[in-house]
């Protein structure tokens, strides 16, 4: 029972860290604020966070609403629940990578709360690609299948965050990610394994063809590996912003692959 209680505490802490969803205080009693073990619950937390978007897809699909309108509301629901946390990370990362002459200037730019040209373009592309991809493939699935596919994507993109976080050292010692601690090796393995398994099961239940599932997993791997390598070269490590950007980029990659393959 203790293990089960600890796991659900980790789920609750992960939901609180990754979203604006209020979580009861009891899950944080005696907790030091570290997420080294809690990251094992990121994929499941991602599914819970994506439930409002999935319900939106099911309900609007059931009444045959416009696919473009449905896609916009799905992405809006996701951003509302997370407080656009991951989008903020993507924008800051784009500004830092695009405008920084070196590691120090990139990190300084990423700390600036103001959005620049690179960040604005990154957000436009992220929202645009996700909306257009959803509008392309959701009409080809049942309403329930579309909602379940969103949950699968959420599990994968949160697993990607853990992999990126675990593979790189902190780029700065005073950042949010550094304060949360490094993911523990067993927790990282659980996050990756559960993320992949949950996504596979959910994609199967959604009715997505096997070829499309394989292509989406290929896009997932390519996105997280490529971006982690770029972050290592640019910053020599990760930040909270690059972890958030990892979620966005892998979600874009998976949804784009599904739109191409279904």
UniProtKB/Swiss-Prot annotation:
Gene Ontology biological process terms from the UniProt entry: cobalamin biosynthetic process
Enzyme Commission identifier(s): 2.7.8.26
InterPro entries reported for this sequence: CobS
Primary location: membrane
Cell compartments where the protein resides: Cell inner membrane
Protein's membrane topology: Multi-pass membrane protein
Entry's Gene Ontology cellular component terms: plasma membrane
Matching NCBIfam families: cobS, PRK00235.1-2
Function: Joins adenosylcobinamide-GDP and alpha-ribazole to generate adenosylcobalamin (Ado-cobalamin). Also synthesizes adenosylcobalamin 5'-phosphate from adenosylcobinamide-GDP and alpha-ribazole 5'-phosphate.
Listed name of the protein: Adenosylcobinamide-GDP ribazoletransferase
């Amino acid at each position: 029972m203790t293990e089960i209680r600890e796991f659900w505490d980790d789920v609750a802490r992960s939901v609180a860290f990754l979203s604006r969803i209020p979580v009861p205080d009891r899950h944080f009693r005696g907790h030091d604020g570290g997420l080294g073990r809690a990251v094992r619950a990121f994929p499941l937390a991602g599914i819970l966070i994506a439930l409002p978007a999935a319900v939106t897809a099911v309900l609007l699909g059931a009444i045959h609403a416009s696919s473009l309108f449905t896609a916009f509301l799905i992405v809006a629901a996701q951003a509302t629940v997370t407080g656009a946390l991951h989008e903020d990370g993507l924008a800051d990362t784009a500004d830092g990578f695009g405008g920084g002459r070196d590691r120090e200037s990139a990190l300084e730019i990423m700390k600036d709360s103001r959005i620049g040209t690179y960040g604005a373009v990154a957000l436009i592309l992220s929202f645009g690609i996700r909306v257009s991809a959803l509008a392309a493939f959701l009409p080809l699935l049942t309403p329930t299948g579309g909602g379940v596919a969103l949950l699968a994507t959420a599990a994968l993109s949160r697993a990607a965050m853990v992999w990126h976080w675990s593979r790189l050292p902190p780029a700065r010692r005073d950042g949010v990610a550094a304060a949360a601690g490094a993911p523990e090796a067993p927790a990282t393995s659980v996050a990756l394994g559960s993320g992949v398994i949950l996504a596979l099961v959910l994609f199967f239940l959604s009715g997505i063809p096997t070829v499309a599932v394989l292509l989406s997993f290929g896009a997932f791997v390519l996105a997280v590996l490529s971006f982690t390598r770029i972050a290592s070269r640019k910053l020599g490590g990760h930040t909270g912003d690059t972890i958030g950007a990892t979620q966005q980029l892998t979600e874009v990659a998976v949804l784009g692959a599904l739109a191409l393959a279904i």
